[in-house]
From Swiss-Prot:
Protein name: Trigger factor
EC assignment: 5.2.1.8
Gene name per UniProt: tig
Limits of the PPIase FKBP-type domain: 163-248
InterPro entries assigned: PPIase_dom_sf, PPIase_FKBP_dom, Trig_fac, Trigger_fac_C, Trigger_fac_C_sf, Trigger_fac_ribosome-bd_bac, Trigger_fac_ribosome-bd_sf, Trigger_fact/SurA_dom_sf
Provenance organism: Anoxybacillus flavithermus (strain DSM 21510 / WK1)
Amino acid sequence: MSAKWEKLEGNQGVLTVEVDAEKVNEGLDEAFKKVVKKVQIPGFRKGKIPRSLFEKRFGVESLYADALDILLPEAYAKAVEETGIEPVDRPEIDVEQMEKGKSLIFTAKVTVKPEVTLGEYKGLEVEKLDDTVTDEDVEQELKRLQERHAELVVKEEGTVENGDTVVIDFEGFVDGEAFEGGKAENYSLVIGSGTFIPGFEEQLIGMAAGEEKDIEVTFPEEYHAEQLAGKPAVFKIKLHEIKTKQLPALDDEFAKDVDEEVETLDALKEKIKERLTKEKKEEAEAALRDAVVQKATENAQMDIPEVMVKNETDRMIREFEQRLQMQGLNLDLYYQFSGQDEAALREQMKEEAEKRVRVTLTLEAIVKAENIDVTEEEVEKELQEMASLYNLSVDKLKELLGTLDGLKEDLKMRKAIDFLVENSKVVA
C-alpha cells in the first residue's frame, strides 16, 4: 500500500491511497462470504453458491460496495499513520479505481489539526494571588455557618422585611383570566431570593400576617412561557405567616453543634482557619496555572478549523446534559424553562469551546517542543489514584478505559502546565 499527502489551503489536504491488487482480492473474498449467505438460487442451499456462478449471475461489481466497507477503514487508518497527519473530522472519500485484479485507488479530503506557532511560553510573568487567611475571613465563615444553622421562627409582630420567609396563597391573572401554573396555597417564599419575576417579592415587603393584597407585575419579555412573555399580570395575595431567621449565639455550644470534633469556639476558629488556608493555597495554585496557560495561549498563533470548535461544543453540550440528568432534568426541560433553544445554547458555548481548543492545541505544541513524555510508573500511579477515587480495582479501571492513550495525553498536558509554572516568573 502507498499513501501520499498533499496539503491544500487552510487546514485541508488530500490523501491519495493505493491498495495492492492482492489486498483488493482478499476484500472481495470477504465480501463474497458475507453476501452469499443472503442469496438464494434454485438448486443450491443458501450460502453454498459457487463463486463463479455468483459472479456470472450477479457480476463481480455487486461485491464492490461490501468490499469497500472492508478495505477502506483499514487502508485509511494505515495511510493516516504512515503520513503522520492528524485528522479532526471524517474524510470525504472518493473512489477512483475499484476493480477485481487491480489495485484500489481512492482519495480522502481531510481536515487536519492546524499548525501552531508558539510565541513566548518560557519566563512568563504572572501574579500569584494572596493566599493569606485573615481574622476577617474566619469571622465571615463563622457568619455563614451561623446563617446555615439559623432557625426560622414565626414573627408575631411587625411586617415583612427583606430576608424573611413568608407563607402565602396566590393566584395570577392575565387579562382577567387565570393561567396555568399561576396558583398555589401555603407557598413558602424567601423575600429577596429572586424566585419570582421582578417586582413580585418587593411588593410583599411591608405586608402583615393575615393581610390580603393585589400586586401588579409584568412578565419579562424573555419569559419561558411564550403566552405570558411581556404581559402585565395581577396576583391576588393572602399572607398567612411571616418567619424570620433566629441566629444561634456564637459560643462553645454552637461550635460543638457545627463540628463534633471540637469543644470550644476558639478550636472551631482554628479549624476554620486551617481549612481556609488550604483552600486559598489551592485556589492560588490553580489561578497561577490558569494564568500561565492563558498567557502561553495568547502568545501562540493558529488557524482553528470550525469543525474543531463544533466538536468541542458538542462535547460541552453532552457534559451539560449529563449534569442536568444528575438533577433529574433534561435538555428539553432546560430549553423550556430558560426560553433558549439548541442554537442559542450552542452560540452561548461557542466562545468557551474555541478557548478550550486553543488551550489544548497550545499545550500539545509545548509537549512536542519540549519532548514531554510520561513514564509507565506515572501512568500506573495515576491509575491507582483514579481507582481509589472511584472505589475500583486497577484492573477493572483499565477494562473500563479500554485504551490508556487518553490518560497518557492528559498526563502530558498536566506536565506541560507544570513546565510552564516551573519556568515562569511569579510576582507578588
